Amino acid sequence: FFLRIEVTDDKRYVEGAVETIVNVLDYFEIGFDEGAAVDGERGDYGPYHQSQRAEVYQTFVKRLIQRGLAYPCFLTEEELSDIRSKQEAEKLNPGIYGKWAVSRDLSYEEIEEKIREGKPYVIRLKSSGKTDVPAEEMDTITVDDAIRGPITMPANNMDVVLLKATGIPTYHFAHVIDDHFMRTTHV
C-alpha cells in the first residue's frame, strides 16, 4: 500500500505530522510500499504530498472547463451568505444549483472581463442533475457496492467547488484525481 499526505493548503499543515505518522506505522510494524517518507518519497506515482501536485489538478480543471463540465464562479462571500439565508428561509437545500448558480452560463467575454477586473473566483463542477423537479422525477445513480449490494441515490444537482480561489483543489477533487493516477483500488 502507499502513504499519501492529503493536505492541500498550508492552514492545515502540521509541522512534524508526516514524521509522526511514519513513526507510528513503523512502531506497529505496518510497512508501506511507497509514498511519503521521513527522508523524502519513494515510489512510481508521486509526488505523494497533495500540496506538490497543483499542476496535475490545474490540468484537469482546464479539461473540465474546455468540455463544459466546470465553470468559474464569481460569487462573493456576501452573495453566498445571502443565497444561504434565502434558501434557509424557503426551506430549500443549501448550495449552488439551479437559479442560485448565477455564474454558470456566463459568456466567454463576461468571464474574461471579470478575470481582467481581478474578481476572485472558484471553479465549480457543472452538475448534470435536475434541480427544479419533484423528488420522484430526479435522476438517480445506482452503484453496486461489494458489501451492501446495489445502492441507489439521487444524482448530484449541486455545482460544488473543485478549485478554491487560491488555486488549491478541494479535498474531494484532489482525492479523485490522485486515486485514479495512483491506481488506488481499496481504501
Say what each PLM segment does.
Residues 66, 71-187:
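Active-site cores that bind ATP or allylic diphosphates and position pyrophosphate for catalysis
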Residues 1-92, 168:
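N-terminal Rossmann-like or analogous alpha/beta NTP/dinucleotide-binding catalytic cores
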